[in-house]
Amino acid sequence: MQDTLAVILAGGMGSRLSPLTDDRAKPAVPFGGKYRIIDFTLTNCLHSGLRRILVLTQYKSHSLHKHLRNGWSIFNPELGEFITVVPPQMRKGGKWYEGTADALFHNMWLLARSDAKYVVVLSGDHIYRMDYAAMLEEHISKNATLTIACMQVPRHEASAFGVMAIDDDSRITCFVEKPADPPCIPNRPDHSLASMGIYIFNMDVLKKALTEDAEIEQSSHDFGKDVIPKLIATGSVFAYSFCSGKGRVARDCYWRDVGTIDSFYDANMDLLQPVPPMNLYQKNWAIRTYEQQYPPARTVSSATGNEGIFINSIIANGVINSGGSVQHSIISSNVRINDSALIVDSILFDDVEVGEGCKLIHCIIDKHVKIPPYTEIGLNPIEDRKRFHISERGVVVVPESYQFSTE
């Protein structure tokens, strides 16, 4: 796909995912015991044959840059392949990106330099698997100028998305960004057709649309709010069904925006279902990431004779469970679990130590936290709220490197 450029938007603040995003960009947030969120979009590019990639970063990007350098420096420049991380260049004035379209407009020089005919615009903060090659093939076959990936969502949730209407040929006839009263799908009044934020543009159309949008002072410079509605009138904008079953990836129709603590928690817990709604085990679509070379996880007996137990959990390398019990949880690399500790319905990031007799229920523990013996988290909301963030649905989040009081 030498005529196609992938651009991944990875610069959002991710404030709704705080405190997990207090010191890192949302695409760099750990997920599923060993991955980062951006790994899913990058893996899709890799397996789809997209080997020319720009990653546009902005806020708190150090952790993301480090991960991309360590884990994704796999492309061969001699074959025209690259993954280039692009922080704001301030080429269009001394200001940060003001919207999704503005991010690309500020980097128009890189788009032009690529000599690409098509541009695949992606978000770096969604969890899903998709063969972009199949979408590009349909884009070309329909002679489209813009193709938007879409999926059906319950109408009561559709206000969080761009919503579209299509004709019998999948041509988009109407597009509204985050409408208060979302239009429904004909013959299915309880569902709407939502944009996934995945776009394929013809390069010439994209450059013209970005230039025109940049000249409008009152524009918010956003694809969904400003650019796409204007292009609909051309009659050559089409929808691509995410659940069409096309392409090499297994048809699981799983796509999640993990922009809040609750949605992030739910997506992790989805991996623990007896038959997970997203299949991470498809051999020819393995999710790539970077991970340090830790030894295998193990369980050992404690000094009191308790055996370390894992039940229906995901356990990363380097974990040692010395007489604790882990149930329906995700344990990331290099975690230490001590005697009689109980961990249930929880997510632990790297380098956490759980002290003897601790009880962790329905919580997320960020990196580099040492939990003192007999600490209880997730059992008393009143006490937890004094120290930690609690989500709308009661998930307790302990921030990175949190220091417990020794009093």
Swiss-Prot record:
Keywords: ATP-binding, Carbohydrate metabolism, Glycogen biosynthesis, Glycogen metabolism, Nucleotide-binding, Nucleotidyltransferase, Transferase
A Pfam cross-reference name: NTP_transferase
Keyword Cell inner membrane in record: no
Pathway the protein acts in: Glycan biosynthesis; glycogen biosynthesis
Catalytic activity of the protein: alpha-D-glucose 1-phosphate + ATP + H(+) = ADP-alpha-D-glucose + diphosphate
Enzyme nomenclature, EC number: 2.7.7.27
Gene Ontology MF term list: ATP binding; glucose-1-phosphate adenylyltransferase activity
A Gene Ontology biological process term: glycogen biosynthetic process
Disulfide bonds: none
Family: Belongs to the bacterial/plant glucose-1-phosphate adenylyltransferase family.
Its job: Involved in the biosynthesis of ADP-glucose, a building block required for the elongation reactions to produce glycogen. Catalyzes the reaction between ATP and alpha-D-glucose 1-phosphate (G1P) to produce pyrophosphate and ADP-Glc.
Record-given protein name: Glucose-1-phosphate adenylyltransferase 2
Native source organism of the sequence: Vibrio cholerae serotype O1 (strain ATCC 39315 / El Tor Inaba N16961)
The gene coding this protein: glgC2
